[in-house]
């Protein structure tokens, strides 16, 4: 069994690792954007969010008659696997890239398409049966997918952020108690003001962070 497969785009043929769920567009992004060490799979909430968007689009396109059921089912199953934490290692593009997220969107399209092809009984790269753009990305653009996925990723990540912020609140409150009797000059309008304690300042920071977290929870 060969260790590569040949995929084609408008720039020509390229060898893609045979075991990769991504395709030629992702391969070119890996070559063009070697900017940071932060890969898409380092942010599982964003990967899951991309799958949610593609999953919803596939079912909507099916209901509207633009995508046949077999293709929609394959896309939906591939997305569900990604939502459950599978195949994340194939989301490999650099988070810092040109094109406002186009490479990220194509990475998701190709992974979902190739996994969908396997579900349908075909080989990876046989896009005549399930295409990354024509099927997985049907009715979408990067400017639809990426902003939506980023917002979903923030929502998915918020419980972990809230836990971390509670740790910060507790630490600030503890410092407030520790320095509760240490006087300092207050500052307002770029000049000295009424004296206060260092502890009061720490407690004010703790209260501010706590209120911001509570306000965010209301909106979520």
Language-model-detected regions and their locations in the chain:
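Generic N-terminal targeting/processing segments that precede catalytic cores or assembly contacts
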Residues: 2-95, 110-111
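Glycine/serine-rich anion-binding loops at beta->alpha junctions
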Residues: 21-22, 90-110, 137-146
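Long, non-coiled-coil amphipathic alpha-helical linker/lever segments
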Residues: 46-60, 141-197
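Charged, amphipathic alpha-helical oligomerization/scaffolding segments
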Residues: 52, 56, 74, 81, ...
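Short, flexible active-site-proximal loops enriched in glycine and acidic residues
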Residues: 68-72, 82-95, 119-143, 173-188
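Alpha-helical scaffold segments that form or flank carboxylate-/histidine-based iron centers
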Residues: 98-102, 191-205
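A glycine- and small-aliphatic-rich helix-loop capping segment at beta-alpha/alpha-beta transitions
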Residues: 108-122
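Conserved small/polar residues in nucleotide/adenosyl-binding loops
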Residues: 218-220
């Amino acid at each position: 069994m060969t260790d590569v497969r040949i995929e084609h785009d408008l720039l020509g043929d390229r060898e893609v690792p045979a075991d990769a769920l991504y395709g030629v567009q992702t391969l070119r992004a890996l070559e063009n954007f070697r900017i940071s060490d932060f890969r898409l799979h380092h942010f599982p909430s964003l990967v899951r969010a991309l799958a949610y968007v593609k999953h919803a689009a596939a079912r909507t396109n099916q209901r509207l008659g633009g995508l046949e059921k077999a293709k929609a089912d394959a896309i939906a199953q591939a997305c569900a696997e990604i939502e459950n934490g599978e195949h994340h290692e194939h989301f490999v593009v650099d988070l810092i890239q040109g094109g406002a997220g186009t490479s990220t969107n194509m990475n998701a399209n190709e992974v979902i398409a190739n996994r969908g092809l396997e579900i349908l009984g075909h080989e990876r790269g046989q896009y005549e049966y399930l295409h990354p753009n024509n099927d997985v990305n049907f009715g979408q653009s990067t400017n639809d997918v990426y902003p939506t996925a980023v917002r979903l990723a923030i929502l998915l990540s918020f419980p972990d952020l809230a836990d971390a912020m509670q740790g910060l609140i507790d630490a600030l409150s503890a410092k407030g108690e520790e320095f509760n009797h240490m006087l300092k000059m207050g500052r307002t309008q770029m000049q000295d003001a009424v004296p206060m304690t260092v502890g009061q300042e720490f407690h004010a920071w703790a209260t501010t962070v706590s209120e911001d977290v509570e306000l965010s929870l209301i909106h979520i």
